[in-house]
């Protein structure tokens, strides 16, 4: 890829994510992008909240546990959105600031439900230290996902959904806070 073409796609990816942060390109699936976000910002034993209201929320719980994270699941029935108040309660109860991240799916592919990512991210921001890691594979490009305005730290997406491109590429946008967490992260990294 020429430097001119590279400049164009980097600029357009930032525009799509509504961010001034870095957007990285990975040759892999949306799952690879989300796993990359998890392993590059967290460390073994870190406490995380995972939203689970469908197949992909379920997947992030499994991935987080596979990497030795301490996972608290906030669950909703399939076909129902995650309750932002459940996240608020869990985050407010965390006076020791042990929760390092909230991991959730914006648009749950398996059911079509869109979770209130904006409200949940607002509660994470009020916590003060936790990161918001969002699976936006089916939402980015199809609905509004203003990364900077919502205070999202990691946004994972894939070419084959909202981008309407052939599969095989995925994208990980990382905030400055996510890059700081990367410096401390000790999980094994393949991406």
Regions found by a protein language model. Give the residues of each.
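Single conserved hydrophobic/aromatic residue that forms the stacking wall/gate
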Residues: 1-5, 9
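Active-site phosphate-binding strand-loop segment of PLP-dependent enzymes
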Residues: 82-139, 162
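General beta-strand structural signal in soluble alpha/beta enzymes
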Residues: 24-27, 50, 73-74, 103-104, ...
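Conserved active-site segment immediately N-terminal to the catalytic lysine
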Residues: 148-160
